[in-house]
Amino acid sequence: TRFIIGDEIQYGEFVRSIKILIGKQNPLKLSELKLIELVERHDYRIGIKSNLEPNIKEGIGGLRDIHTILWVSIFMFNIYKLEDLTSINIYTKEEIKELKNAWKFLLTIRAFIHLFNESKGDVLSIENQLKISKKLSYKDKKKEKGVEIFMKDLFVNVAKINSLLRTFYCLLYTSPSPRDMPRS
C-alpha cells in the first residue's frame, strides 16, 4: 500500500496490522499460493485475443505480475520496495531500473485507458491503442505506423516484466537463499 491522502496515523496502524498478519503466515506457503495463482492466470491468457487487445493488468507481463513480485518479496524477505531486492541479489540495479520503467509504462497506458473509457478498465482495445500512441507522441515512420511502434514497445515491456518475474521465481526456488546468489 501507499499513503495518498487521509489520516496518516490510521494508515500507519493499518500497515502495522498487515505486517503482523503476514508475519503469522508461512512465507513459503504464501509464495507457493501466489505462484499457483500466477500459473493459472497465465494459462488462462494463452490463446485468447490478448495479443491483439492485451489486458494491461492481468495479462502475461502485466501489472499483476509486478504485484506478485512485490507480495512475495514482502512474504519471504520483508522487503517492501523493488530497489531493495538488489540487497539480496534477486535483481541487479539495471534490472530494477528496467522493471520500474516497464511498470511506469504500463501504469501510463492504464491511466489513459481509464481516461478514454471514462471508467475503470484494463484491456487495451484497438481503438485505444491508436489514441494512446498519439498521446504518447508515437509518430509514423516510412515503414511503420506510430501505433505499431507503440505496440512493439508495449510487448518489449511486458516481455521484460515476464522475464524478470521468471528470474525471481527461479532464484527463489533454486537457491538455498537468494542472498547467496552472486549477481553482476
Feature names for model-found ranges:
Residues 1, 109, 184:
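Catalytic metal-binding acidic patch
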Residues 25-172:
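Conserved nucleotidyltransferase catalytic core and NTase-mimicking acidic/glycine-rich helix/loop elements
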Residues 173-182:
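Conserved small/polar residues in nucleotide/adenosyl-binding loops
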